[in-house]
Structures are given as C-alpha cells and as structure tokens.
C-alpha cells in the first residue's frame, strides 16, 4: 500500500470516538483562536472588498455565514471571506514543520460546509481533525523546499480543506 493510500484509509476510517480527548480539546482551542483571528480583521480595508465580491458574485443569502458581518451567503463565498478574514492579521495558527496555517483553510471550509449540511459540532470537530491531519502530513512530506516557491497554505491547504469537507460528506478512501 502506498503512503497516499495509507493516509486516505486512515482519514476515511477516522471516527470521533477514536480521537483522543486532548486532541479534541486542542481542536476546540484552535477553532476559537481562528474565530478570534477572523474577528480581529474587522474594519481592515481588504475584508469589505472580499465581502462585496461575495455579495456581487454569490447569492443574496445562503446556508453559511460570514463571521465578521454575520451575513449569510453560499458555503463557497463564506469560506472565501472567512478564510481571508482569519489570515489577514497573521495571528492564525502555524504548524512549523509543515509550514502551514491549517486553521485558515480547514476551519473556513469545514464550518461553511457544516452549516450547509446541518452537521453537528462533533461532525465539525471530526472533519477539522481530518483536515489538519491531511494538511500537516502532506505539508511535512512536501518539506520546506516547497515553501521556497509556493505558499504551502495555498497549495497543501487546498487538500486539507478538501479532506475536511469530504469527511463531512462521508467520502470513502477512494473519493
């Protein structure tokens, strides 16, 4: 079995009940920190630009919320604005060896999808842990040399967000 298949199997089989209590508590702390980072961007010039873009390009309302304004929009645009908001003030978490800011990409996507799919807090935590696991492991595999050319949060973070949302959607290891 390849490393990719092993990781996909691990993530697909991951269940809330098997996550250590300390990991769940840390994930809750990271989630609150992420919300604080997003709210800290309130009033910063770029955020209204992202919100106006979401307003013009997206639906008038939707199933997911923008943290800073409380406005509802599509999950796609809520994740976009919340991700930008939470990364703007550079207070979001950093995992050093993967050179990744996982909260920005994982929580933004997972919260928007969880709202859209009417998922529970447990589901949100499980999906977030899966997204963090994927992002950190892939980021560590890519190594620091990847960061010399690419912004790991943008490249590896895309995969981390996809894994988190896939977990909410019930994807199996092949998906």
Where are these regions (language model features)?
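N-terminal core-entry segment
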Residues: 1-175
């Amino acid at each position: 079995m390849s490393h990719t298949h092993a990781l996909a199997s691990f993530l697909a089989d991951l269940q809330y009940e098997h996550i250590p209590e300390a990991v769940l508590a840390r994930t809750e702390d990271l989630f609150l920190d992420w919300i604080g980072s997003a709210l800290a961007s309130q009033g910063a010039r770029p955020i209204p630009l992202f919100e106006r873009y979401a307003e013009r390009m997206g639906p008038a309302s939707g199933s997911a919320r923008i943290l800073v304004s409380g406005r509802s929009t599509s999950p796609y645009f809520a994740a976009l604005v919340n991700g930008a908001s939470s990364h703007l003030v550079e207070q979001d978490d950093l995992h050093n060896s993967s050179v990744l800011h996982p909260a920005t990409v994982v929580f933004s996507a997972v919260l928007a999808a969880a709202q859209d799919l009417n998922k529970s807090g447990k589901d949100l935590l499980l999906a977030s842990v899966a997204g963090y696991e994927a992002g950190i492991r892939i980021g560590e595999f890519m190594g620091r040399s990847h960061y010399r050319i690419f912004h790991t949060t943008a490249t590896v973070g895309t995969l981390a967000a996809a894994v988190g949302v896939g977990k909410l959607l019930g994807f199996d290891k092949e998906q």
